[in-house]
Amino acid sequence: MESEGETAGKPMKNIVPQTCQICSDNVGKTVDGDRFVACDICSFPVCRPCYEYERKDGNQSCPQCKTRYKRLKGSPAIPGDKDEDGLADEGTVEFNYPQKEKISERMLGWHLTRGKGEEMGEPQYDKEVSHNHLPRLTSRQDTSGEFSAASPERLSVSSTIAGGKRLPYSSDVNQSPNRRIVDPVGLGNVAWKERVDGWKMKQEKNTGPVSTQAASERGGVDIDASTDILADEALLNDEARQPLSRKVSIPSSRINPYRMVIMLRLVILCLFLHYRITNPVPNAFALWLVSVICEIWFALSWILDQFPKWFPVNRETYLDRLALRYDREGEPSQLAAVDIFVSTVDPLKEPPLVTANTVLSILAVDYPVDKVSCYVSDDGAAMLSFESLAETSEFARKWVPFCKKYSIEPRAPEWYFAAKIDYLKDKVQTSFVKDRRAMKREYEEFKIRINALVSKALKCPEEGWVMQDGTPWPGNNTRDHPGMIQVFLGQNGGLDAEGNELPRLVYVSREKRPGFQHHKKAGAMNALVRVSAVLTNGPFILNLDCDHYINNSKALREAMCFLMDPNLGKQVCYVQFPQRFDGIDKNDRYANRNTVFFDINLRGLDGIQGPVYVGTGCVFNRTALYGYEPPIKVKHKKPSLLSKLCGGSRKKNSKAKKESDKKKSGRHTDSTVPVFNLDDIEEGVEGAGFDDEKALLMSQMSLEKRFGQSAVFVASTLMENGGVPPSATPENLLKEAIHVISCGYEDKSDWGMEIGWIYGSVTEDILTGFKMHARGWRSIYCMPKLPAFKGSAPINLSDRLNQVLRWALGSVEILFSRHCPIWYGYNGRLKFLERFAYVNTTIYPITSIPLLMYCTLPAVCLFTNQFIIPQISNIASIWFLSLFLSIFATGILEMRWSGVGIDEWWRNEQFWVIGGVSAHLFAVFQGILKVLAGIDTNFTVTSKASDEDGDFAELYLFKWTTLLIPPTTLLIVNLVGVVAGVSYAINSGYQSWGPLFGKLFFAFWVIVHLYPFLKGLMGRQNRTPTIVVVWSVLLASIFSLLWVRIDPFTSRVTGPDILECGINC
């Protein structure tokens, strides 16, 4: 394969005039309406985005004739351009991305000119501000991001706490900048693998000592070598323009039969329901009516679940291309910064060792250290969490360099040392075995120290906890304490064992006071959003539960292949990764892996508008969390024949064009979607002119009304590429960080309604993702071969049912709220099938009511010797058989294209029944009570520990046994019904066996689906709870009375009537 440099001078044939020869897109038009011509020498067809990329980051010359590109009208200037008059017109604004940053500088100026000695409070604005004294927040050039030399590396900022005392907070807020290349990519018509292989071969060929001879003495060989070097550089530049990801459709041989069977099943279902409705059972009308209503609901539920899986897709990422574009070796990394959130509440339910492993895997992630910041939210204000995080930061100084030196996976020490694999595979350093043994010993000592802290925390002293310096712990009262921030690690705040910097690690506990609504996890996440925006302001945010560690150290790079893609990234609100779990037995009795949902449902949604947000393992675009809409894609339309004949000018005023775009977007925006967006802010300030201070003041006041009373935070929301202002000091930033986590900060703002995690449901993840999709954003589903994250699944039936109960309760809350997808957001840009998926997500708990009734029908039919269908005819047999065959065919073809095993699919079907008749049923009634009567149900956190001897063990057991009663009752009812039916058939003769088989099949269908529940009930700690025994005895007594009433052993043969025959009959 020839390189680009070798073929550059050859004439290229078969060139389509209107097609870009780099990216195969349309060349497009100039602002004057003429065809865009990048090179005026050879007119080689190149589109404007590729032209701009070549000028900015390429070789700045035409690919065919090698003539240097001239600066065209509307193009930004680059170093080396000659002075050309008439080019700096209004078109330049189109490519002037840092315009937003100028506004943010002005916004911050109002805050910083108030004086350094003032306390945090209501913002005060000066009447006049000089332009010459406005502090610079950022600039067009790359800045170092370092604070002034007078700033200390670590300093103490105090916050007033109860009793008038002051609490020290360690701080290290130096932040490196980050730039994002937003130009489109091209050259997508050459295979990546072949080109890289060719480049490597040339690298090996040209490797050798560099000669110092003069150019005149080297001859033609050296000229060829220099040409090869230029060709290699051109090859790398070409690869950097390639797309960072690719969407791969399911092969038609697998997806088309699946779609055909779905349509066939829909037709059969309609014919089946028509038969059921038109053929009632006269002697069992009530049973028939109940069964038909249940079947109609099941059909509706199946439609809502099935059709969002119509367009499943796979995705591939190219990490090498990402590195070539943003992270080249020997150059400063241009990868975007990522703020990682870890949330925890109760360290006794969520063991500190589990949280520590999650934090260690984050600190050791394969990403530039100055681009990673880890924020740990302790919403329980536990001193145990604080001290264990301090121990974790010390152990990280040894663990992180060990991971990066030997490239180990996973980078959570507990799971790395517990993995039963050949840890010597692919390891070539002779020191690895010795270092691994030493590190394992270090980790065991670290575990002992954490266990000692846990043991100490079990006995709280009467006077409360006291810190090492003798001061009381501010969080002794978990419902009344100040905000706390502690920076453990960071730039210039401590190095690892080899002298390298470590990612920033920050402990955060938001302020809580009586009388303020805290909104549980959603409120804690929003507090982290504000703190991180003030201290580091990474443009992307990764959200992890405390028990979900990073299993793939390149997970962040996988997400950046979508979020930093110039074409796709601007439209993406988040990248969702599937949840994978450790510690599950191979049988997976309770469908803990949830493979059907993660490998089938979410892949189907990825082909529509993207997967739903599942609460963890998700990388967010910070702009989307702020409630902004995505940029509108401008579709270039060809001019009509009439406009050409009229000869009208196609050059439009830029302001009129903006108004037109706003009107166009307004037609697709829901009335509840925020009216603020970056374009409106820019236009308002730009229209009045930078000299109009009144307009600037009004813009800031409107933003502070939306985001809260913090000028520093408001300014950070306008910085598209993130970062902190170089002029700010660590003292001011930490003081502002304490302010934004105060309990009253969100009052009279849009937090929780339009910004951040949305309030109103215990499952805040569904609402948050739904609001983003309703605004027009799309999400991406990323499934790398090595799972990105792994977590701890519930290990027993009790934890699993309580977890499902919480999810279902959140769905019921959304169903009865104003954000219900059945009626919310129809003026927005939510796609139809995506709405189907969200509707199914909210109404699925309601299915528990018809499911419970339908599972009870077999036993009732067996007891009463009636059935839900009339005598089966040949036509009815065909409909029943066709329906069952279509159900099995759909499942088989679904497993075929998704790769899900039949055992996983069957376990999912079983747990759908188990959860439906237990947790979902309770969630419906508790949700109705909460919405209508205001009776709130408090849920404890799902335990991640192996034992259950906590303070809430009795309450936990009571809740578990309450969920146990409905499925236990169903099992007993159907088992007794089977015995009663068989006994009746034995005493009724041969003719009663035929109808009995249909009833028995119906009953066994219920029993088989509940079998894992029965097995779990009998196997829980080798004992059955007392209340379950009492209920079982009670139910057995009830059905014993029914048995006597039925009296199956009494002869059913009747003789002649004595009244008719007389005595001599």
UniProtKB/Swiss-Prot annotation:
Mutagenesis or variant effect for residue 571 to P: Reduced homodimerization
GO molecular-function terms, A-Z: cellulose synthase (UDP-forming) activity; protein homodimerization activity; zinc ion binding
Topology Cytoplasmic: residue spans: 1-260, 305-842, 896-910, 983-993, 1045-1065
GO cellular component: endosome; Golgi apparatus; Golgi membrane; plasma membrane; plasmodesma; trans-Golgi network
Binding site for UDP-alpha-D-glucose: 343, 349-350, 379, 520
Subcellular location: Cell membrane; Golgi apparatus membrane
Reaction catalyzed: [(1->4)-beta-D-glucosyl](n) + UDP-alpha-D-glucose = [(1->4)-beta-D-glucosyl](n+1) + UDP + H(+)
Binding of Zn(2+) 1, residues: 20, 23, 47, 50
Entry-annotated residues carrying Phosphoserine: 3, 151, 211, 216
Coiled-coil intervals, chain numbering: 433-457
UniProt family annotation: Belongs to the glycosyltransferase 2 family. Plant cellulose synthase subfamily.
The protein's name: Cellulose synthase A catalytic subunit 3 [UDP-forming]
